[in-house]
Structure formats: C-alpha cells, structure tokens
Amino acid sequence: MAFEPAQHSFITLEGVDGAGKSTQARLLARALELAGYQVVSLREPGGTAISEKIRALLLDPANTAMGDTCELLLYEAARAQLVHEVIAPALAAGKVVLCDRFYDSTTCYQAFADGLDRQIVRDANNLAVADTHPALTLVYHITPEQAALRMAARGAADRMEAKGMAFQERVYQGFCAIAAEEPNRVKLIDATASIEDVFAQTVEQVRAYGLDISQDAVTAALVQEAE
C-alpha cells in the first residue's frame, strides 16, 4: 500500500480506556527521538488552546445532559483545529506525528457505542481531517473487563469512562470491526502482555512501516520510563 510522503509518518494509537496506549505512545515517542526523528506527540481531544477547552467540556462528569450529536460535533471541532494548527504543518515539515486517539475513537465511541449512524460519523471525520489521514493505526487489544481491572486504581472516572461496561464492550467491538475492515492500516497489538512485550510489538509494526528504530533506542526508552 502506497502512502503520500507527508502522511507516512502519521501514527495513531487506539484502544479501550485502560488498554495502555498512552504509555506506549510515550515510549514510542522517546524511542523515535533517540533514533533521530523529530516527533510531535499529541492526544485527543486536545493539543491546541481551542481543542483543550473543548476537551474540558467533553470530559467534565457534570455535563451529563450532553446529547450524542453535540458530543460528536465537539470532538470533530477539536480535531479540525488540531489538524489545522498542528498535525498538517508538522507532517509538511517532515516530522513524525504520534496521536493518542484520533478518528477511529470517534467511530467506536459515537457510532458503535452511542449508536449514531456510521456514515454520518464517517462524513464528520472526513470533514474534520481535511484529507490528513493516519498511515498506521495501532489498536491496543484488551477486553473491557481486563481494562477495568487496570483502571480501578485510577480513582474518579471522566464522563466517557463512567458510561459503564456495556458501553465499553461496544467500543471494544468497534475497534475489532475497524481492524478487520482495514488490515493494511490498522494493526492489533496484544495489550495483555507486559509493557516491554507490548512495546516490542509496537516497535515491530512501526519498523514495518519504514521508520528505523534501533534496539539501543528501544532499550533506552524503556530505561527512561522505569526511572
């Protein structure tokens, strides 16, 4: 599968809450930087002043009255600003962009879990990203039950995390469906393994997409994480 040069270094990390993708995003960013790449690390929603304000609205547990369509459009507004202000310029400059969640999360949460029409969600995603699509998406594969055990120590849940196990199960099924539909772009990572083993899988997939990460960089990233 061929990729445009500006898009080849756009990697997104996805999964249910508690899958460990944020840890892997941090490790991957360190390893890539140690390997000599310029890396922009982001997480959604957020990443710009405007997007962070929208994030606060979306995740505030007090906003229980928020409707599904309102939620979708807020996510897309935050994403559109992030692409416009940060992602597209970084890719044009030849940087590697890592994003902890992107539009696949919207598909899973708003279409599969909330029940919005999938084509409407797809159209909204496409409008927001303006042809800036990830070349590689890593889905950290773990069941909602396993993820819930990991999250138990976190304390208070945000508005999305508090939606319950049935909701998280639909999100999980959504990620499984997307991985089956787009195997060239979306790769499943066994997130039930140790952090080191999960990172080894992550690096293997990133290397397969043409980014050279030495074993020394991998080891150093893990050492820094443990400090």
Give each language-model segment a name.
Residues A2-E4, L27-A29, E145-E227:
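NTP-dependent small-molecule kinase module
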Residues A35-V129:
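ATP-dependent small-molecule kinase phosphotransfer cores
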Residues F10:
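Walker A (P-loop) ATP-phosphate-binding motif of ABC ATPase nucleotide-binding domains
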Residues L13:
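Hydrophobic anchor at the beta1->P-loop junction of P-loop NTPases
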Residues Q24:
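Hydrophobic positions on the alpha1 helix immediately C-terminal to the Walker A/P-loop
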Residues K21:
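Conserved lysine of the Walker
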Residues G18:
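Walker A (P-loop) phosphate-binding loop of P-loop NTPases
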Residues R101, S105-Q173, A177:
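A glycine- and Lys/Arg-enriched "phosphate-lid" helix/loop adjacent to the NTP-binding pocket
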